[in-house]
């Protein structure tokens, strides 16, 4: 064999090994996410649905749970996609010739983007509708009962739904797109209609993020306040615990010995009072066990961090609005070749990349908080060991829509300059200046409005509680104080 043949063979072997390595890394990453999501979903599922007398229903619920786990793993992968790409680029810039990070390259990142796009389409269009119809199916009339009969009914329903959605997408593309070829190429499902459908879903997800994120940014302050110990400057914890124990003992004694009172007792009301007093006592004990640093510095530092992150995100969006008016390069666009390790995507280098990653995670958490805080989706909020299977399916679909729109959301707002890879950059509406500009302006305006309305009221209330002014007998506006009433009677 000649020398050129050896060179060709070595190149082919290298490409083969790189491909196998990328497959192994992708499989390990997905397996890790799948295990984490399975553990997470088992904490919220309703155990009665999986331990029923009917083995058929339990089998159906187990299959639906595995499909939900797969979808949630893809959603978590979509959340980690953009931060992982930004960090990988900075690592390759810092250590360009390190032997131990040769597996980290542009081909791997580009492949992960394509896999997330593919499996997001698969989950939204096929797996989640299949899981819902599968749990609701009972088999065709006259057919034998069993899992196979349910599968037949589910497949038929899914085919009808696919035809309906495909027809709607074809009509929408024919109306919105003036290209005659798009109306005649109905057979071109994979190259045109599936990305077009996902583009519409992603656009709805970006609009949902526009509504939920400002609401979540405002709610993050109150949610953090419930998780941390708030400082109280003028309080005696021992006295409050002593009083709380006496208040709890009175209704408890009435419940244990109802015959001691000659008046009829409302036992349900007494139980609610005991539960409320026990909750109050647990909070007081938590405050007593907390250290002085945790009581006095933890909550203010957390509020300061939230305020800095929120203000920084609004500032970046405002700067991006000005860049849109000046430079056309600020528009979000797709990138076909993932050339990583050549230039930093932040003006501040690695420090700026860390800030970008922190802002992306912060906005994603805020959007989830805002989503479950909104009145429209509050009923979807999962409960510990008490979440129905259909509710789990709905949560997985909503989280996948939000997470798959996160890369487009972050690039549209200018939080990062990392261009969208693969099919994420093929969305037609990303090239519309008016949509991108109005989206940035709406986000900045809604976030500022929610912060001004919510944060100022929350700070005022917390300052009043911190100084103990809420326990003072202050007069209510519109009514004279008690002393003046006594003087009037005299």
From Swiss-Prot:
Keyword flag Oxidoreductase: no
Main location: membrane
Entry GO CC: endoplasmic reticulum membrane; plasma membrane
Residue spans, topological domain Extracellular: 1-21, 88-114, 176-196, 327-350, 410-431
Cytoplasmic side: 43-66, 136-154, 218-305, 372-388, 453-490
Record keywords: Cell membrane, Endocytosis, Endoplasmic reticulum, Membrane, Receptor, Transmembrane, Transmembrane helix, Wnt signaling pathway
Region entry LCN1-binding, spans: 1-76
Region described as Interaction with LGB: spans on this chain: 1-59
InterPro entries: LIMR (IPR008075), LMBR1-like_membr_prot (IPR006876)
Pfam families hit by this protein: LMBR1
Membrane topology of the entry: Multi-pass membrane protein
GO MF terms, alphabetically ordered: transmembrane signaling receptor activity
Similarity comment: family membership: Belongs to the LIMR family.
Function in brief: Plays an essential role in lymphocyte development by negatively regulating the canonical Wnt signaling pathway. In association with UBAC2 and E3 ubiquitin-protein ligase AMFR, promotes the ubiquitin-mediated degradation of CTNNB1 and Wnt receptors FZD6 and LRP6. LMBR1L stabilizes the beta-catenin destruction complex that is required for regulating CTNNB1 levels. Acts as a LCN1 receptor and can mediate its endocytosis.
Subunit structure: Dimer. Can also form higher oligomers. Interacts with LCN1; this interaction mediates the endocytosis of LCN1. Interacts with UBAC2, FAF2, VCP, AMFR, ZNRF3, CTNNB1, LRP6, GSK3A, GSK3B, FZD6, DVL2 and RNF43. Interaction with LGB and SCGB1A1 is controversial.
Family annotation (PANTHER family): LIPOCALIN-1 INTERACTING MEMBRANE RECEPTOR LIMR, PROTEIN LMBR1L
Protein name as catalogued: Protein LMBR1L
């Amino acid at each position: 064999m000649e020398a050129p043949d050896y060179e060709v063979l070595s190149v082919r072997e290298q490409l083969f090994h790189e491909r196998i390595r990328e497959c192994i890394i992708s499989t390990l990453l997905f397996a890790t996410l799948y295990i984490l999501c399975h553990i997470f979903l088992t904490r919220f599922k309703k155990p009665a649905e999986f331990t029923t007398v009917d083995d058929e229903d339990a089998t159906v619920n187990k299959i639906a749970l595995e499909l939900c786990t797969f979808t949630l793993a893809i959603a978590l992968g979509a959340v980690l996609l953009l931060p992982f790409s930004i960090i990988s680029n900075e690592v390759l810039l810092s250590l360009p010739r390190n032997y131990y990070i040769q597996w980290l390259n542009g081909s791997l990142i580009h492949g992960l983007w394509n896999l997330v796009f593919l499996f997001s389409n698969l989950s939204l269009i096929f797996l989640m509708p299949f899981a819902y119809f599968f749990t609701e199916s009972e088999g065709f009339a006259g057919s034998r009962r069993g899992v196979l009969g349910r599968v037949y009914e589910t497949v038929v329903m899914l085919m009808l739904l696919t035809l309906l959605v495909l027809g709607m997408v074809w009509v929408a593309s024919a109306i919105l797109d003036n290209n005659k070829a798009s109306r005649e190429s109905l057979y071109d499902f994979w190259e045109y209609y599936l990305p077009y459908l996902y583009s519409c879903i992603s656009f709805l997800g970006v609009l949902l993020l526009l509504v939920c994120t400002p609401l979540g940014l405002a709610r993050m302050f109150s949610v953090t306040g419930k998780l941390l110990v708030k400082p109280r400057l003028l309080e005696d914890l021992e006295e409050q615990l002593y009083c709380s124990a006496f208040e709890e003992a009175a209704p408890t004694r009435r419940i244990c010995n109802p015959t001691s009172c000659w008046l009829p007792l409302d036992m349900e009301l007494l139980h609610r009072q005991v539960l409320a007093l026990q909750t109050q006592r647990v909070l007081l004990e938590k405050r007593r066990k907390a250290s002085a640093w945790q009581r006095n510095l933890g909550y203010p530092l957390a509020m300061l961090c939230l305020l800095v992150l929120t203000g920084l995100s609004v500032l970046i969006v405002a700067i991006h609005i000005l860049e849109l008016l000046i430079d056309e390069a600020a528009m979000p666009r797709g990138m076909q070749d993932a050339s990583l390790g050549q230039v930093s995507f932040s003006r501040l280098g690695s420090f700026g990349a860390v800030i970008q990653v922190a802002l992306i995670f912060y906005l994603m958490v805020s959007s989830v908080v805002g989503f479950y805080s909104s009145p429209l989706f509050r009923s979807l909020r999962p409960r510990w060991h008490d979440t129905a299977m259909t509710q789990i399916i709905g949560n997985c679909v909503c989280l996948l829509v939000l997470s798959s729109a996160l890369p487009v959301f972050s690039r549209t707002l200018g939080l990062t300059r990392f261009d969208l890879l693969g099919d994420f950059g093929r969305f037609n509406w990303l090239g519309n200046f008016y949509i991108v500009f109005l989206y940035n302006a709406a986000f900045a305006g809604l976030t500022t409005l929610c912060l001004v309305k919510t944060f100022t009221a929350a700070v005022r209330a917390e300052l009043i509680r911190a100084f103990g002014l809420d326990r003072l007998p202050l007069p209510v506006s519109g009514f004279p104080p008690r002393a003046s009433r006594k003087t009037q009677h005299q």
